[in-house]
Amino acid sequence: MVRARNLAKRFGDKRVFDGLDLDLPPGGFLLVTGPNGSGKTTLLRVLAQLAAPTRGELVLPPREVVGYIGHEPLVYRELTPLENLTLFARLYRVPERGARVGMLLERFGLWGARHDRVSTFSRGMQQRLGLCRVLLHEPELLVLDEPYNALDGAGAELLDAALDDLRGRTFVVATHEPRRVERLATERVAFA
């Protein structure tokens, strides 16, 4: 569950958002839209517990069960996808690591490149690998900031299918492509 009451975030004199109320039940899907610089990323960072609100009440799941992907996927470019996911699976204490890693690499079309250095990947392939990393530990709350960023048509379709498969989990998604996830949204926040 995600609940916010009178949530506010400021940077000095700049008000990013103020008086925000949210009620997102387990399994809900919050779609966050708005132009660049409107506060989408700041809100997502607060909900992912990477930044503190300036004011307000906030009820969130424990940090260990939150998965977050920002504009830049957190992956090690000098490693292979297999090495990246195996490392994160150990850190997250994922049971049956090999099977989980293999399934995610296959799901996101990276199995054939599992032994290639991430530094040779396109931005879209790195984004898909970042999504694999986020999904490794099967988080209860997924906070995705522009997950379609840099994905080509095939990559976007793979993400669409993954989001459909993950219905029942709680999502907060900011995107400039709301049409891709509109069908999943149960709640909306639109920044001006």
Question: At which residue positions do the language-model features occur?
Answer:
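Catalytic Walker B motif of ABC-type/P-loop ATPase nucleotide-binding domains
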Residues: 142-146
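Hydrophobic anchor residue at the start of the ABC signature
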Residues: 131
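The feature captures the beta-strand-to-loop junction immediately N-terminal to the Walker
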Residues: 33-35
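Conserved ABC ATPase "signature" region
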Residues: 86, 96-113
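Conserved structural motif at the start of ABC-family nucleotide-binding domains
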Residues: 2, 17-19
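Helix-to-loop junction immediately C-terminal to a conserved catalytic motif
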Residues: 48
